Amino acid sequence: MQVVKRDGSLQEFDGNKIVEAISKAFNACCPEENKEVITAMVADMHLWDGITIEEIQDVVIETLRDYGYDDVASAYSQYRSEQ
């Protein structure tokens, strides 16, 4: 699956990047959460070919909120705005 980066270039999707970013947000809020929970959330995300980085970030925030991790979604959103 191809992802459209901020500069418009295409890159092969790497789910590990999402896991890493979510892990950082969890560490800021809930360090007791484990990587298996995060990996399961990423597996549940509905992504599509040609998705943009911004759309992926929106899906991440929505998924975190769906799982009841509002604090983590806020931390991720803050991390996102710093990028």
Regions of interest found by a model, annotated:
Residues M1-Q83:
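Long, C-terminal-biased catalytic regions of enzyme "large/alpha" subunits
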